[in-house]
């Protein structure tokens, strides 16, 4: 194994992050320094620039800006209030009712908007003050909001699953979307169990039981928002349209729904477009930079070296998957999700394929690992959003966050070692 390129890549990347260099620049500079081991400066600079551009030259990636815009439209279109109202009628009378409402609403919001940060922001700003008024500690409310927001990244439509499809060399987007449902719901149920137990232990108030009439009324109010999932996912799975075409349909549906709800006006559209453009620019820069690093690693045979190293430790699937899970949990602590998927999929996927693992199953394992990282300092973006919305500190949130982390890790290992949790639904549709 050639250690020098790996050492240069790892040390330069961690060092750049440590001194506060933006992630995209850290990735690009690390890729460049790694390539300089083998080729002269001018070709190295030229190749990195080319790879950033060609890395974005993919029809599948067109879905990302459209889904981001759709999520922004849904977020500003009053969807969060309607989902919360519906969730409240279902679980509001149970112990920890408001926490359970947060989790269910976040799962639905994340699935529809496709953004954990949007979900954490919306749920935290709406439910946070209400939870505090009912006697919940704001630290517990923030912990529930932070962890539940990430479940929507597993429940489609999910931009990061599209990114994984690209990084894996063509894993079916439809299969990935279907594979995310059971793991996402299972993780949400585990979070609900912990939240309910914690609320019962602390003696938090229980809400009033809703009438059947009220359940039906709030459901009807939420149906137009939920129906978008049926249109988008149903269209992709049945082959009526591709994920990219589905994303454009989602934008059209979101605009029409926002006007019907009277939450979006023509005057608000420019700001919505500006916000979604800014988010898209960040995501696309990260994708381009990550593609340059992936190419640099392939050029230096780093994935093959790591694959050989892992398989030399053991050829036991259980042990190798345990090692990969631990590595991905560490990666999630220090790296944003999109670059992590693009950089580490080419490294670990060949290993798990040799062990007989399905690429779709591994995609769900990887995303759930990185979802846990989004809730973890030092770069957990959802953690910072949730703490900021709740007006508290990371140190105070850690205690209520720990039991939620534990059940997320339990869910991770169940999903890792019980592949049918991910593969049953795709198999049902012959995907």
Feature roles, as predicted:
Residues 1-431:
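Alpha-helical transmembrane segments of multi-pass membrane transport proteins
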